[in-house]
Swiss-Prot record:
A GO cellular-component term linked to this record: membrane
Superkingdom to which the source organism belongs: Bacteria
Pathway as given in its UniProt record: Bacterial outer membrane biogenesis; LPS lipid A biosynthesis
tRNA processing in keyword set: no
Naturally occurring in which organism (per UniProt): Haemophilus influenzae (strain PittEE)
Underlying gene: lpxB
Protein name: Lipid-A-disaccharide synthase
Length: 390
């Protein structure tokens, strides 16, 4: 490797990966001003100077049906990327998330003497744990957002570095509620519940009804309570509004385009689907209840595949039931309202418990606030310069 101008390959498959890639390139350029960056990039990575071999949108395929439909094209792209990388011989290949695409590329490149890093651990600790053996063969190192992920890899002697979470870097330890209310143009003197029904159509389909009925029950208990409903895009908004028209036509809601983070900061509590949103709510210091429903067969299979005691990231990080998880038959309006009312009550013990929970959230935030972009770049530098054992 030329110490001053390495060739660094990065492949991102979606918007979140493009954001990570751009942050990583920015940090690497500070150390290697003359480095060349190639791969599959989105607009943010392109703006940082990455040469893209394929439009990132070509890899952004969601859902089994979509994947099957586009499989021949995806396989062709993967074959071309492998061929190009074997010709270019980059000093390191960094697969950013997109494990179904990147791990096969990494496997081939590592076998041909190219250093590989997989950035963002797949949820191998939760399900399909046998993937750990493929990851071990494919990568010189995994970069993990969360400490329990590194602990899992350590058990299998797979090189892994905990770098902290980029979201923990982006959200302040003490979020500014007044500023969030101003952004949303809502009255900070009011009491709010944020309702996040998920970003996927299937989540809205299964969660909108119980979440709306929960809001109705809470409105009876807390007449001054108002509801903030951020929706990820126009498609989800239309879907949600159609369900609301049938279930709760007279319930007043503040429908918001995007801005989920500001809604959670402004709210006194949050009702949400599991996933990254639960981590974001924790970082926003919003007491939450996690609710999730899916098709009975999907749930039957998931129960047998998932190997963790909890499904939400705050509970997984704490390794205890910090926030209620109401799954499948427990995801009812009555139970959700009961759990949320504890956060919304003005009762002295409820207020005290709320403060204790927020302190737990702050402690967990500090644990994963490590300047992830810089940590990721240092891991790449260590691998390139031979200071990391591989």
């Amino acid at each position: 490797m030329n110490k001053t101008n390495p060739t660094i390959a990065l492949v991102a498959g979606e918007v979140s990966g493009d954001i990570l890639g751009a942050g990583l390139i920015r940090q690497l350029k500070a150390h290697y001003p003359n480095a060349r960056f190639i791969g599959i990039a989105g607009p943010r990575m392109l703006a940082e100077g990455c040469e893209t071999l394929v439009d990132m949108e070509e890899l952004s395929v969601m859902g089994l049906a979509e994947i099957l439909k586009h499989l021949p094209r995806l396989l062709k792209i993967r074959k071309n990327i492998i061929q190009t990388m074997l010709q270019e011989k980059p000093d390191v290949y960094i697969g950013i998330d997109a494990p179904d695409f990147n791990l096969d590329v990494e496997l081939k490149l590592k076998a041909n003497g190219i250093k590989t890093i997989h950035y963002v651990s797949p949820s191998v600790w939760a399900w399909r744990q046998n993937r750990i053996h493929k990851i071990a063969k494919a990568t010189h190192q995994v970069l993990a957002f969360l400490p329990f992920e590194k602990a899992f890899y350590d058990k299998f002697n797979v090189p892994c570095r905990f770098i902290g979470h980029t979201m923990a870097d982006a959200i302040p330890l003490k979020p500014n509620r007044a500023e969030a209310c101003q952004t949303l143009q809502i009255d900070p003197a009011q009491r709010y519940l944020a309702i996040l029904v998920g970003s996927r159509g299937s989540e809205v389909e299964f969660l909108a009804e119980p979440f709306l009925k929960t809001a109705l029950l809470l409105k009876e208990q807390f007449p001054d309570l108002q509801f903030l409903v951020p929706l990820v895009n126009e498609k989800r908004r239309i879907q949600f509004e159609a369900i609301k028209a049938k279930i709760t036509p007279n319930l007043d809601l503040h429908l918001i385009d995007g801005n989920a983070r500001q809604a959670m900061i402004a709210a006194d509590a949050t009702l949400l689907a599991s996933g990254t949103a639960a981590l974001e709510a924790m970082l926003c210091k919003s007491p939450m209840v996690v609710g999730y429903r899916m098709k009975p067969l999907t749930y039957f299979l998931a129960k047998r595949l998932v190997k963790t005691d909890y499904i939400s990231l705050p509970n997984l990080l704490a390794n205890e039931m910090l926030v209620p998880e109401m799954i499948q038959e427990e995801c009812t309006p009555e139970l959700l309202a009961e759990k949320l009312s504890v956060y919304l009550s003005d009762d002295e013990s409820a207020v005290k418990n709320r403060h204790v929970l927020i302190q737990h959230f702050t402690d967990l935030h500090q644990k994963i606030q490590c300047n992830a972009d810089k940590q990721a770049a240092q891991a790449v530098i260590d691998l390139l310069e031979g200071t990391e054992n591989v």
